[in-house]
């Protein structure tokens, strides 16, 4: 008579499959119903139990992340974008310091992160820039993102020293990144058709030598706003050809044709921020943005304009929980696509719904990463607790590089024309 052991062994895979299915059904995953009714009948249950497990097609599963703020949390009409109250800011600005096992929590900002509060009354240049912006209905990322350097950049000792980063396409973004305080909406107001001309007029009036243009993400537009961005750059160059223009753009949802439109508009520096290391990107940025997609944007700019034809630039925030190896890997990936300039700055939590600061990086650590970036071959690196992607300290160096390259190009073209003229003269004489 046959032993019952082989029969039990044959039944074992089926029992394991049924147990695995039962365990999966108890997990708190959100699932998409496969039909009009999500509750199976008793007859369906019995037939499913008798069927072979591999033949059962599982319902598609998506993960509902309840630990982070969703896009709805950032929608302007559903969640306040007001900054933290002083008492809340004091409570939330904490950091763990000290060696392992002896860590302590501090609730005061490090001295290197404290900056004077800007005042329009104390600085006439600051007041003038602010008045011009209001008069022409223009927005700046300096104000919308609550940049700590606004007093320093806007309050330069003269017009050439003052810097403002103009934010195009309105003050409302279609994305909800968990580090950014810019307003969010699924359907922002329509574009202002007069914005390109108004922006060019304002910049010509200020008499700057270098300007940064950035924008909100406009996923609601077919081209992501690329043509509007490019038209603004062309108007600026028409009014003041000597003005150097840096464009800090979004990823245009990965549409490289739109990247090309902006890259060919006449700008001098193309900036696009990866913001953080690859492993933290899904938690820090809107889920529509990826680290690899950002690399493709930066790489495509070089393909369109040539390796020496344009400077590419990106920025990384520190203090979000990134590891040293993750930061090394991010820099290696950026060099692979020939990024020229990188900046490092301290992440600061703008409101309670945004990500908490994991660590306050010391000035010495920022200097260490600056040296490491330069050793890896980056053309320039601005690194410091209050450095942001458009910080003016980097612009002076980049401006000199651009003007030097422009001068070399002019000399090269002049030599080429002289040689051609000499050859034409010799042909005529012969």
From Swiss-Prot:
GO terms for cellular component: mitochondrion. Keywords: 4Fe-4S, Iron, Iron-sulfur, Metal-binding, Mitochondrion, S-adenosyl-L-methionine, Transferase, Transit peptide. GO terms for molecular function: 4 iron, 4 sulfur cluster binding; lipoate synthase activity; metal ion binding. Residues 28-62 are annotated as: Disordered. Residues 156-379 form the Radical SAM core domain. It catalyses: [[Fe-S] cluster scaffold protein carrying a second [4Fe-4S](2+) cluster] + N(6)-octanoyl-L-lysyl-[protein] + 2 oxidized [2Fe-2S]-[ferredoxin] + 2 S-adenosyl-L-methionine + 4 H(+) = [[Fe-S] cluster scaffold protein] + N(6)-[(R)-dihydrolipoyl]-L-lysyl-[protein] + 4 Fe(3+) + 2 hydrogen sulfide + 2 5'-deoxyadenosine + 2 L-methionine + 2 reduced [2Fe-2S]-[ferredoxin]. Its EC number is 2.8.1.8. Pathway: Protein modification; protein lipoylation via endogenous pathway; protein N(6)-(lipoyl)lysine from octanoyl-[acyl-carrier-protein]: step 2/2. [4Fe-4S] cluster 1 binds at residues 142, 147, 153, 390. Disulfide bonds: none annotated. It is an enzyme of class 2 (transferase). Pfam families: LIAS_N, Radical_SAM. It is found in: Mitochondrion. Its cofactor is [4Fe-4S] cluster. [4Fe-4S] cluster 2 binds at residues 173, 177, 180. Residues 1-29 form a transit peptide. Belongs to the radical SAM superfamily. Lipoyl synthase family. This is Lipoyl synthase, mitochondrial. It comes from Neurospora crassa (strain ATCC 24698 / 74-OR23-1A / CBS 708.71 / DSM 1257 / FGSC 987).
């Amino acid at each position: 008579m046959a032993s019952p052991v082989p029969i039990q062994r044959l039944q074992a895979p089926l029992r394991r499959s049924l147990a695995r299915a039962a365990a999966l059904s108890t997990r708190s995953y959100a699932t998409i119903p496969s039909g009009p009714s999500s509750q199976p009948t008793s007859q369906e249950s019995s037939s499913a139990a008798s069927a072979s497990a591999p033949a059962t097609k599982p319902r598609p599963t998506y993960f509902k992340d309840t630990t982070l703020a969703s896009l709805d949390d950032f929608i302007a009409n559903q969640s306040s974008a007001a900054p933290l109250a002083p008492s809340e800011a004091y409570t939330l600005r904490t950091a763990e310091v000290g060696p392992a096992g002896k860590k302590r929590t501090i609730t005061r900002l490090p001295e290197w992160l404290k900056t004077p509060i800007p005042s329009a009354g104390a600085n006439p240049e600051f007041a003038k820039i602010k008045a011009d912006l209001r008069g022409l209905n223009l927005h700046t990322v300096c104000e919308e993102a609550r940049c700590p350097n606004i007093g320093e950049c806007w309050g330069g000792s003269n017009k050439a020293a003052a810097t403002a980063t103009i934010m195009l396409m309105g003050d409302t973004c279609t994305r909800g990144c968990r580090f950014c305080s810019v307003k969010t909406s699924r359907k922002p107001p329509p574009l202002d058709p007069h914005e390109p001309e108004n922006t060019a007029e304002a910049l010509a009036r200020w008499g700057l030598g270098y300007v940064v243009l950035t924008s909100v993400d406009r996923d609601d537009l077919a081209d992501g706003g690329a043509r509007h961005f490019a038209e603004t750059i062309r108007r600026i160059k028409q009014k003041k050809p000597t003005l150097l223009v840096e464009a800090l753009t979004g990823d245009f949802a990965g549409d490289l044709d739109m990247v090309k439109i902006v890259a060919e508009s006449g700008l001098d520096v193309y900036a696009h921020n990866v913001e953080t290391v690859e492993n933290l990107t899904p938690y820090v940025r809107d889920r529509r943005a990826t680290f690899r997609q950002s690399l493709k944007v930066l790489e495509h700019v070089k393909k369109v304009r040539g390796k020496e034809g344009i400077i590419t630039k990106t920025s990384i925030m520190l203090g979000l929980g990134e590891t040293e190896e993750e930061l090394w890997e991010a820099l290696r990936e950026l060099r692979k696509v020939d990024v020229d300039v990188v900046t490092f700055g301290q992440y600061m939590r703008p409101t309670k719904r945004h990500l908490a600061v994991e660590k306050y990086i010391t000035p010495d650590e920022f200097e260490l990463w600056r040296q490491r970036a330069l050793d890896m071959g980056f053309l320039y690196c601005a690194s410091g607790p209050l450095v942001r992607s458009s910080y003016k300290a980097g612009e002076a160096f980049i401006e000199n590089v651009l003007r030097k390259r422009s001068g070399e190009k002019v000399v090269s073209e002049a030599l080429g024309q002289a040689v051609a003229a000499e050859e034409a003269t010799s042909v005529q004489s012969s």
